[in-house]
Structure formats: C-alpha cells, structure tokens
Curated annotation (Swiss-Prot):
Gene of this entry: chlL
The protein, known as: Light-independent protochlorophyllide reductase iron-sulfur ATP-binding protein
UniProt binding sites for ATP: G10, I11, G12, K13, S14, T15, K39, N180, R181
Originating species: Pyropia yezoensis
Gene Ontology MF terms in the entry: 4 iron, 4 sulfur cluster binding; ATP binding; metal ion binding; oxidoreductase activity, acting on iron-sulfur proteins as donors; oxidoreductase activity, acting on the CH-CH group of donors, iron-sulfur protein as acceptor
Lineage start: Eukaryota, Rhodophyta, Bangiophyceae, Bangiales, Bangiaceae
The protein's role, per its UniProt record: Component of the dark-operative protochlorophyllide reductase (DPOR) that uses Mg-ATP and reduced ferredoxin to reduce ring D of protochlorophyllide (Pchlide) to form chlorophyllide a (Chlide). This reaction is light-independent. The L component serves as a unique electron donor to the NB-component of the complex, and binds Mg-ATP.
C-alpha cells in the first residue's frame, strides 16, 4: 500500500507521518517513508539527524544512476522504518517537484518499491503542482493533515481537488482527514458536512508532540522512557489500524473556493449565531429535564 500525506505547510505532517510509520511498523508492516520536501527533514524524528538526500547521493556519483545502491539512499530509522529523503535543488533554482519524480524513478530502478508493505510519501506543504502531485500518481490513498482552522481546511479543500483530478486516471482514494493540534473539531465538522470525507483521528494540542520534533524522536521512542506518553501513541496506532484495513476511502467533491471561503469565514465572523444556537440547545435541554 502506498500512502501520500499532504496538508498545509507547518501543520505537523512530518511529525505525524513519522509516528504513523512507526505505528504501522509496530503492527508488523515493513515501512518505507519518503520525504518529498527540499528541506529534507521529513525523517528527522525517525533517524535523529538529517540524512543525505537522493540529490546529495547522485551528485557524489556524478549522476551515474547505475552506481547507486539501495544502502546509499535508504537509512534505517527508529522502529525498523526505512527512510529516504528526496531533497531538492538549491533555493531559488530548479524544480523541487522534478526531484520527487526522479526519486521515485531511482527507487523503482533499485526495486525498492517491491520490498515494502507500506510506502509513505510525506509531501511538501500544500503545494500540489504537477511535480509535487507526483506521489498521487503512485499512491493508493491520500491522507490530509489539518487543524480546526480556516487556512488548513482551505488547503485541505485544494488537496481534495487534486485527489479528485488524479482519481480520474489512477486508482486513488482519499483515506480521510487527521486533525492535529486541536482541542476542538467544530470547524472540521462544518467542512466535512460540506465536503463529505472520513476523519480518521483528531489529536489534541499536546506539548510533548512539539517537543518530540525538537528532540528528533518519535512519541513511541519517548514513551519508552516516559510511560505516561503511551496514550499519545494510541492516537497513531488507531490511525494505523484503520489504514491497514484498506478503507474504502472517497473521491471527494471539493467545495468551490468562494463558497468555502464564505462558509468558513462565516464561522468566525458570526460567532453570535453559534452562541445563540448553544443557548437554544441549552433551553431545550432544560425543558427536557423538567
């Protein structure tokens, strides 16, 4: 199974991806995580350092693909998860999306794709141009990371549009949303009422998740020392369990931009209607109690 993880930049895709990869590994799956971002920090919490990228390796080999071996580009991370970083061109030069395509090409030539139960692509921000949408060409499922905010859900809607477009010619489905760093899900629920799709999990705002990124460790590794963190790992295990069952998924029908903008902004601009509804609900509850 191949899984492409997308979401607004800075939403926590890489941290979430690494923990999902470990969760899948703990369920007995052989996992490869491919970082598709020029920052090449997708697998940092799995390996504890910034591993050399595909581009770094090709440069050292003078771009002789035939001289590249799997061990040159695949690094072992925590929990037995194998890691690859695509890398990218120098800032302001070249096309990062092209590098993603070349990474997939190289791994296929190395027959690396055939050795894993699950391949997870952790993809740059919410950029879904042709190059960075390339992982969707190979993926069985797309997973969108979001929070309960306007910008992240607006980005999720654009990604949903890309999934729908790719699903015309590829066997691709949207597995669903994962809410991250949010204690509420009211805006998420408002969005999925408009654009129906599953919500696999909603993780609350947990400081240890942010700290794990700084430490270069997954929550599972931190939980080996601090048993109180086991409950956080359960969120990721729940996501893994749902993915392993190969859910039916959906081909989403995204909301037009202006309609979605109006829908989500109204949630912020008209809080009185929300408060009023809560008051009505409470009055109805009081009558029921009487």
């Amino acid at each position: 199974m191949k899984l492409a993880v997308y979401g607004k930049g800075g939403i926590g895709k890489s941290t979430t991806s690494c923990n999902i990869s470990v969760a899948l590994s703990k369920r007995g799956k052989k996992v490869l995580q491919i970082g598709c971002d020029p920052k090449h920090d997708s697998t940092f919490t799995l390996t504890g350092f910034l591993i050399p990228t595909i581009i770094d390796t090709l440069q050292s080999k003078d771009y002789h693909y035939e001289d590249v071996w799997p061990e040159d580009v695949i690094y072992k991370g925590y929990g037995g998860v194998d890691c690859v970083e695509a890398g990218g061109p120098p800032a302001g030069a070249g096309c990062g999306g092209y590098v993603v395509g070349e990474t997939v090409k190289l791994l296929k030539e190395l027959n690396a794709f055939d050795e894993y139960d699950i391949i997870l692509f952790d993809v740059l921000g919410d950029v879904v141009c042709g190059g960075f949408a390339a992982p969707l060409n190979y993926a069985d499922y797309c997973l969108i990371i979001t929070d309960n905010g306007f910008d992240a859900l607006f980005a999720a809607n654009r990604i949903a549009a890309s999934v729908r477009e790719k699903a015309r010619t590829h066997s691709l489905r949207l597995a669903g949303l994962v809410g991250n760093r949010t204690d509420k899900r009211d805006l998420i629920d408002k969005y999925i009422d408009c654009v129906p799709m599953p919500v696999l999990e909603v993780l609350p705002l947990i400081e240890d998740i942010r700290v794990s990124r700084v430490k270069g460790k997954t929550l599972f590794e931190m939980a080996e020392i601090d048993k109180d963190l086991a409950y956080v790992c359960d969120y990721y295990l729940n996501i893994a369990d749902q993915l392993i069952t190969r859910p039916e998924g959906v081909v989403p029908k995204e909301s037009p931009d202006r309609e979605l903008f109006s829908l989500l902004s109204d949630f912020y601009l008209n809080p009185k209607s929300k408060v009023g509804q809560e008051k009505v609900d409470q009055e109805e509850l009081d009558l029921m109690i009487v």
